[in-house]
């Protein structure tokens, strides 16, 4: 076997029967330009002749025993077609073995272009197909992560957490004789005023304060009577700035106004949530907030880890992978928007966002699975059960990543993948260099 570099992006490999020029394109596209030697085509032609001989019936001869000349006279075109098929299949298989390139299952394969196939000249044909992605090996020690400073729980966060407990036991009385004031509770609709208006909040009850409403909605509802509406432009979140934020027009409608009667903050309130004293309630709330702060730091570490994996270990993805996964995500996103039957005005922006998210998700999936394979990381049944408990605990908050009522085999696969991802990321965090 010989191996020779040719033009940029191309390489030639050969054996006794054929030469293969390999050209790699974007999205794992591979082109095989294959030249087969005459001797190999002669062998393929003889094989094709025997195959056709066994398939046909010629009066006066047993099947498979007819003279070759007679077969060629009557079925010469069939023999030639069978010969071409054999040369294509054999040449392609030999090329795969020589190059160690594997076609992608269910990937795009173009129809072969056959330039010629004769016993005198040999054969020359071109095949283009999607190959499996080549996943680079990850070296965990090459990852450099920064420790995030611990975040202190603020008094405002403690107050908001306590307010959430109070709201569970708040009673409401309608207000009908005045407009909205700060501190009231209201039921509101919020509609984004696109070409086709899109309702994003439907009759939701919230308090008119900083924790209940963003300032740009709060300033519009104060002074409105029940049934009245106001319009404005959305504004960015000052605490969490988004460089891609774009202001859009909206309409807010106050459906009803309520006075909220909150319970006293005492031991009786604590008992309603399964505790004994109000001091114990404060302690539990503080512990929960501290745990959430730690989880936020962990999420930042994971996000930084994922960014480094994408940056340090780039690789190409098959277009069919991207398209199929993007379409599934796009359909889900439009369904959540309630616009699966009509495309939103900013459809192209949404499609690009989904495509970028899809590519990132696929790259991370393959890199993490490569880490698992290289380091023999597996998940036990106990770890799958623990993942189920974690996901069930997240259901009330809406953060669970499983469909508990879905297909049982798919649920098992979801839990296994979540547990494996968790294990791989912990392994990488433990092995990375921290600064």
From Swiss-Prot:
Residues 183-263 form the PPIase FKBP-type domain. Its main location: cytoplasm. It is an enzyme of class 5 (isomerase). The keyword Cytoplasm applies. Consists of 3 domains; the N-terminus binds the ribosome, the middle domain has PPIase activity, while the C-terminus has intrinsic chaperone activity on its own. One of its GO terms (molecular function) is peptidyl-prolyl cis-trans isomerase activity. Involved in protein export. Acts as a chaperone by maintaining the newly synthesized protein in an open conformation. Functions as a peptidyl-prolyl cis-trans isomerase. GO terms for biological process: 'de novo' cotranslational protein folding; cell division; chaperone-mediated protein folding; protein transport; protein unfolding. Its EC number is 5.2.1.8. It catalyses: [protein]-peptidylproline (omega=180) = [protein]-peptidylproline (omega=0). Keywords: Cell cycle, Cell division, Chaperone, Cytoplasm, Isomerase, Rotamase. This is Trigger factor. It is found in: Cytoplasm. HAMAP family: Trigger_factor_Tig (MF_00303). It comes from Protochlamydia amoebophila (strain UWE25). SUPFAM superfamilies: FKBP-like, Triger factor/SurA peptide-binding domain-like, Trigger factor ribosome-binding domain. Belongs to the FKBP-type PPIase family. Tig subfamily. One of its GO terms (cellular component) is cytoplasm.
């Amino acid at each position: 076997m010989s191996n020779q570099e040719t033009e940029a992006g191309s390489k030639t490999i050969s054996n006794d029967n054929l030469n293969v020029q390999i050209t790699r394109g974007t999205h794992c596209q591979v082109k095989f330009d294959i030249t087969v030697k005459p001797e190999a085509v002669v062998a393929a032609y003889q094989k094709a002749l025997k195959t056709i001989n066994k398939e046909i019936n010629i009066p006066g001869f047993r099947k498979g025993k007819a003279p070759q000349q007679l077969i060629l006279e009557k079925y010469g075109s069939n023999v030639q077609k069978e010969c071409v098929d054999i040369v294509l299949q054999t040449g392609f298989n030999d090329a795969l073995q020589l190059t160690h390139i594997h076609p992608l299952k269910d990937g795009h394969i173009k129809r072969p272009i056959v330039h010629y196939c004769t016993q005198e000249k040999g054969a020359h044909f071109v095949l283009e197909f999607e190959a499996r992605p080549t996943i680079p090996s990850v070296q965990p020690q090459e990852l450099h992560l920064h420790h995030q400073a611990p975040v202190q729980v603020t008094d405002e966060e403690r107050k908001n957490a306590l307010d959430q407990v109070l709201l569970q036991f708040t009673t409401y009385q309608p207000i009908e004789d005045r407009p909205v004031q700060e501190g009231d509770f209201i039921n509101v609709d919020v509609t984004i005023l696109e070409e086709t208006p899109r309702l994003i909040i439907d009759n939701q009850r919230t308090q008119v304060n900083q924790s209940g409403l963003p300032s740009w909605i709060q300033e519009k509802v104060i002074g409105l009577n029940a049934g009245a509406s106001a319009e404005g432009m959305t504004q960015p979140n000052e605490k969490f700035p988004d460089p891609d934020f774009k202001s859009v027009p909206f309409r807010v409608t106050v459906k009803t106004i309520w006075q909220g009667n909150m319970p006293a903050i005492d031991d009786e309130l604590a008992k309603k949530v399964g505790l004994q004293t109000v001091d114990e309630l404060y302690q539990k709330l503080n512990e929960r907030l501290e745990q959430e702060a730690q989880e936020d730091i962990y999420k930042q570490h994971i996000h930084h880890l994922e960014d480094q994996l994408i940056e340090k270990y780039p690789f190409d993805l098959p277009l069919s992978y991207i398209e199929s996964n993007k379409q599934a995500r796009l359909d889900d996103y439009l369904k959540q928007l309630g616009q699966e039957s009509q495309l939103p005005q900013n459809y192209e922006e949404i499609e690009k966002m989904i495509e970028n998210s899809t590519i990132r998700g696929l790259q991370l999936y393959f890199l993490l699975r490569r880490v698992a394979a290289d380091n023999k990381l597996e998940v036990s049944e106990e770890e799958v059960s623990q993942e189920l408990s974690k996901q069930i605990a997240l259901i009330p908050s809406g953060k669970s990543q499983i469909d508990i009522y879905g297909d049982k085999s798919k649920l098992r696969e979801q839990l296994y993948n979540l547990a494996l991802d968790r294990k791989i990321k912990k392994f990488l965090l433990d092995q990375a260099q921290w600064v």
